[in-house]
Structure formats: C-alpha cells, structure tokens
From Swiss-Prot:
Name of the coding gene: queC
Organism lineage string: Bacteria, Pseudomonadati, Chlorobiota, Chlorobiia, Chlorobiales
Cofactor names: Zn(2+)
NCBIfam families associated with the record: 7-cyano-7-deazaguanine synthase QueC
Membership in a protein family: Belongs to the QueC family.
Enzyme class, broadest EC rank: ligase
Pathway assigned to this chain's UniProt record: Purine metabolism; 7-cyano-7-deazaguanine biosynthesis
Cofactor note: Binds 1 zinc ion per subunit.
Protein's job: Catalyzes the ATP-dependent conversion of 7-carboxy-7-deazaguanine (CDG) to 7-cyano-7-deazaguanine (preQ(0)).
Protein name: 7-cyano-7-deazaguanine synthase
Intrachain disulfide bonds: none
Lineage: superkingdom: Bacteria
Annotated ATP binding sites: 7-17
Keyword annotations of the record: ATP-binding, Ligase, Metal-binding, Nucleotide-binding, Queuosine biosynthesis, Zinc
EC number annotated for this UniProt entry: 6.3.4.20
Length: 226
C-alpha cells in the first residue's frame, strides 16, 4: 500500500506522516514551495522529516503562482504577519486563498501516476485558525472531486487523521508516536528562532503547554497562551 503525504514541515503534517507510517504505508512525500516567507526553513524541515522516516520518494513542487496571486501575509511582503488572536472570530491574514485545493490537486495527480491509494494531510478544523479549506466538509467534497475527475480504475482517498483533534491532543498523539517535533517548523514569520507571536507559534506553544510538554524548538520569546 502506498500513500502520499502532504508534508509542509509543520507539526500537524509531521504527526499525520507518523500516523500513515504507523499503519504500514509505503510513503511518498510532497512539499510545496509557494513563495511563503519561511519557505527555506520549511523545506529543510521537510527534508529532515523525510530522512527520519526513510522516505526516499519525494516531490518538491514550486507553485509561485500562489505568491503572484497574493492576498496573504504569508506570500505578500506588503501584508504584515499579525500578532496572534486566539479568540478572534475572523479569518487571519495568513490564510492563502484556496491553497489546499491547489495542493490536493497536485497530490492527486501524483498519486494517480505512482499508484498511491491514500493522500494524508494534517488539516485541523478544531482549535484552528478557521481557514475554510481546513474543514472536514471540504475534504469530503474533494473526495467526490477525485472520484469524478480521475480514471475509473483509480481509487484515491484523502485521509485527515487530525481534523477533529484539539492541538494539544495532536501533541499528545505525536509524543505517543515518538515523532521528532524538534525537526518541525511552524512559525509564519521567522527562519531563525520562531517568533512566538504569530498565530501558528501561539497555537503550537499553547498546545504543548496544555499537553504538559515542552516544545523542543527555539523561540525568540515564549509567551504563556494558557
């Protein structure tokens, strides 16, 4: 059995990779560089995680068109990365318009070519930033798109093992699976030490605190988000 994992290098995609590995899939890993601020750090994390799990079949894709489209603080330097607002009801500026649909389309195409049966993605709907393309209903609908848009003999399904978990539960699950959190990168802003203040850093730090664990990566600051 073969599975493609969409591996950004962040903690969620790392744990999703570990879930697929634990089920005995032969893993193929895809990473997308889309002009994000921390693209180099994320790419290094992707490669280190692949090395850790012995994933030899890798695909690194350049999707600069997402940067050209803009509209996100991750890809447009004129839009500042916001300070975290963990109780806000609006979608933050870090949302990249329809990004996951682009990623999934590429992953489906690759899966069809290499004969993968599953696509693993570390999307999180609960305790998340509220991105519309991280909802379970989106992935249910995309599975239907795959069914209609691939060859009749193709059977590819999207797996979202973390979709209904709180971030702290993802940390605990990662600890149980002995994942190398030290190799992952989540910060939206910095490629040196993680900033500790962006939405992604805040949610990660809070998750580790609630799980009773220490995040092993370096931060410029470690605010208490509990």
């Amino acid at each position: 059995m073969r599975a493609v994992v969409l591996l950004s290098g962040g903690m969620d995609s790392l744990v999703a990779t570990a879930e697929a590995d634990a089920l005995g899939y032969e893993l193929a890993a895809m990473h997308v560089n889309y002009g994000q601020r921390t693209w180099h750090k994320e790419l290094m994390a992707f490669r280190a995680i692949c090395d850790h799990y012995g994933i030899r079949h890798r695909l690194e894709v350049d999707a600069d068109y997402l940067s050209a489209i803009g509209g996100s603080s991750l890809t447009d330097p004129s839009i500042p990365v916001e300070e975290a607002d963990l109780h806000g009801a609006t979608i933050p500026t870090s949302y990249v318009p329809f990004r996951n649909a682009s990623f999934l389309s590429m992953a489906v195409a690759w899966s069809e070519v290499i004969g993968a049966e599953k696509i693993y993605i570390g999307a999180v709907e609960e305790d998340s930033s509220g991105y519309p393309d991280c909802r379970k209903v989106f992935y249910d609908a995309f599975n239907r798109v795959i069914e209609l848009g691939t060859r009749p003999e193709t059977a590819i399904g999207i797996e979202t093992p973390l979709i209904e978990l709180q971030k702290s539960a993802i940390v605990r699950r990662g600890i149980a699976l002995q994942v190398p959190f030290r190799l992952s990168w989540s910060c939206y802003k910095s490629e040196g030490k993680a900033c500790g203040h962006c939405d992604s850093c805040a949610r990660r730090l809070r998750a580790f605190s609630l799980a009773g664990a220490t995040d092993p990566i370096d931060y410029e600051q470690r605010p208490d988000y509990i």
